[in-house]
Amino acid sequence: MSGKKEKKHFIVGVIMVAIIVAATATMIYCYINRFDPQEYVQAFLDVSYKQKTESYIKQTGISEKEAKQVFEDNLAYTMEKFPEHVMTDEMTEEYRELFADLAKKTSYTVGEATREENGTYQVVLTVKPITLLKDTYAEFQEKAQEYATKVSNDVMNGQAMPEETQMQTEIYQIYYEVLSQAAEKGLKYGKPNKIVLHVEKDKEGKYEIRKADLQNLDH
């Protein structure tokens, strides 16, 4: 009789241990695979603007090559706004390097996340905008006018009128020189703006930042 009780206690003990181990394993799994919207937003911004890939790879499970491509795609999107027919290959590379450097100096702070009833997270982002374009606009206008005056005087003195594409190329070169020289002296930042980012699941159940919010980041 005593042996049966001991056996019963042993079996119960084994079952309890199994339950505890299973529960602990579940807790560990949930902890390891927990989703932190604040960390996700930080990782996404860092890979997008500063080309820091490590955290984003951990968050999404993508390869390093894919993570690096996020930064490259952002640069490509920026360069699409420039007309290819007036940009030389050398000039395109100069602008690309300039914008890559500016992106890495973007200033942002990721705030705490709050969860909505539908499971969407709201993350407040504080951004200090770089004011380089605004700060250099007057100087660019002045130098562009100087170039226009020079072309006008040259034509008045009998020289051929440059083709429109050639003049546009020259203007973009002037603009690059103004921007790069000002950037070398040090960037200035405007007043901080707060932007609310919504992190929600896509059709596949993976979290992502709402596309409309991403568009607001670039304006």
Regions found by a protein language model. Name each.
Residues 120-122, 190-196:
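Intrinsic-disorder/low-complexity, polar/charged segments enriched in Ser/Thr/Lys/Arg/Asp/Glu/Gln
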Residues 29-109:
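Core segments of small alpha/beta cavity-forming domains
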Residues 110-112, 194-201:
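Hydrophobic/aromatic beta-strand elements that line small-molecule binding cavities or substrate pockets
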Residues 198-219:
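C-terminal/domain-terminus segments
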Residues 1-56, 123:
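Gram-positive cell-envelope targeting signals
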Residues 117-127:
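A short hydrophobic beta-strand element
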Residues 133-190:
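Mixed-charge, low-complexity intrinsically disordered segments
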Residues 127-133, 201-203:
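Beta-strand elements of well-folded, non-transmembrane domains
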